[in-house]
Structures are given as structure tokens and as C-alpha cells.
Amino acid sequence: GVDKPGCRYMFGGCVQDDDCCPHLGCKRKGLYCAWDAS
């Protein structure tokens, strides 16, 4: 994820990893942000 205004927190809706806040990635099966292993 990225640090930008409006970034999605845990379980926020997303289409891609860049929609999520830092340390979060988009889980495409559920279209929500969750912890990214990286």
C-alpha cells in the first residue's frame, strides 16, 4: 500500500494494492485491504 490521502485501512475496499495504506495489500479475492507480508 501507499501513504496518501484517502488510502484504505484494514478491510477497506480496494481494487489494487495502491488503494491501501502502508503495510496493507489488496486481497483481490475479497477486494479488501489486509496485512501485506512485505
UniProtKB/Swiss-Prot annotation:
Keywords assigned: Amidation, Calcium channel impairing toxin, Disulfide bond, Ion channel impairing toxin, Knottin, Neurotoxin, Secreted, Toxin, Voltage-gated calcium channel impairing toxin, Voltage-gated sodium channel impairing toxin
Entry's Gene Ontology molecular function annotations: calcium channel regulator activity; ion channel inhibitor activity; sodium channel regulator activity; toxin activity
Note: Possibly exists in two forms, due to cis-trans isomerization of Pro-5 or Pro-22.
PTM-bearing positions, type Serine amide: S38
InterPro entries: Huwentoxin-1
Organism this protein belongs to: Monocentropus balfouri (Socotra Island blue baboon tarantula)
Family: Belongs to the neurotoxin 10 (Hwtx-1) family. 28 (Jztx-11) subfamily.
Protein name per the record: Mu/omega-theraphotoxin-Mb1b
Location(s), subcellular: Secreted
Comment text on domains: The presence of a 'disulfide through disulfide knot' structurally defines this protein as a knottin.
Tissue: Expressed by the venom gland.
Bridged cysteine pairs (disulfide): C7-C21, C14-C26, C20-C33
Pfam families xref list: Toxin_12
Gene Ontology, cellular component aspect: extracellular region
Function: Paralytic toxin on insects that inhibits voltage-gated sodium (Nav) and calcium (Cav) channels in P.americana (American cockroach) dorsal unpaired median (DUM) neurons, and also inhibits the B.germanica (German cockroach) Nav channel (BgNaV1). May act as a gating-modifier toxin on Nav and as a pore blocker on Cav. In vivo, reversibly paralyzes both L.cuprina (Australian sheep blowfly) and M.domestica (housefly), but does not affect larvae of H.armigera (cotton bollworms).
Protein's UniProt keywords contain Secreted: yes
